[in-house]
Amino acid sequence: MIPIQLTVFFMIIYVLESLTIIVQSSLIVAVLGREWLQVRRLMPVDMILISLGISRFCLQWASMLNNFCSYFNLNYVLCNLTITWEFFNILTFWLNSLLTVFYCIKVSSFTHHIFLWLRWRILRLFPWILLGSLMITCVTIIPSAIGNYIQIQLLTMEHLPRNSTVTDKLEKFHQYQFQAHTVALVIPFILFLASTILLMASLTKQIQHHSTGHCNPSMKAHFTALRSLAVLFIVFTSYFLTILITIIGTLFDKRCWLWVWEAFVYAFILMHSTSLMLSSPTLKRILKGKC
């Protein structure tokens, strides 16, 4: 049990982190959305960032409501909010992975014919790939939706005589829900890892190829990109691991350590959100023009 003062402190930290992420997401959507209306077209990276901004905006509000309902034991409301949080969480993972895939195919210097064909196809069909990630999320959330319905049934049966066989089956399916959610996050994370490793290998190769004993502008750009990619890799991997531990949820007394853990988790998410804002040339150009 931690002191109430410490609980309130971490609760405030979590709320401030959440509000900052919401403001960042709103800014991304507003700035890039306005650019979209003005020029009638956006680069694929900006399409992903707008989608990520919308997804993370909804995810953060769902997270705040979900955590407060969990803390105050509003179980029936919590079941309905959990499915919303899971949907936008999975969608956010897929969009982050697609962003890394885009950078990989755009920046990498691989010349294999299969890679060149993939680059042409992916860039050509990018809006459909975004739609596909939404459809995949809808499909992968089905076990969680069924699991939430089962959770509501279990809550309803708490004060009634139980059929142990039925209850055991319901609880086993509820455990399967968490396994399905974990798999739904692992697949885009593996895609992220593969794209990141390929991109880092390509950038390292380009740096070695252009190395002439002094730092020319091309090498500086490659070093900057490699450093940014390493930071993104560390932050996103930490984000994945903390979310995975949150889903498993067996390491902590949720009510006691909820706000400490959430403040820790969303510190990584805030860093990741900030790094995404800095990854868009369009966004940086517009914001610099406003200053």
From Swiss-Prot:
Glycans are attached at N80, N163. Residues 1, 63-84, 147-182, 250-257 are extracellular. It is a multi-pass membrane protein. One of its GO terms (molecular function) is bitter taste receptor activity. One of its GO terms (cellular component) is plasma membrane. Belongs to the G-protein coupled receptor T2R family. This is Taste receptor type 2 member 16. The gene is TAS2R16.
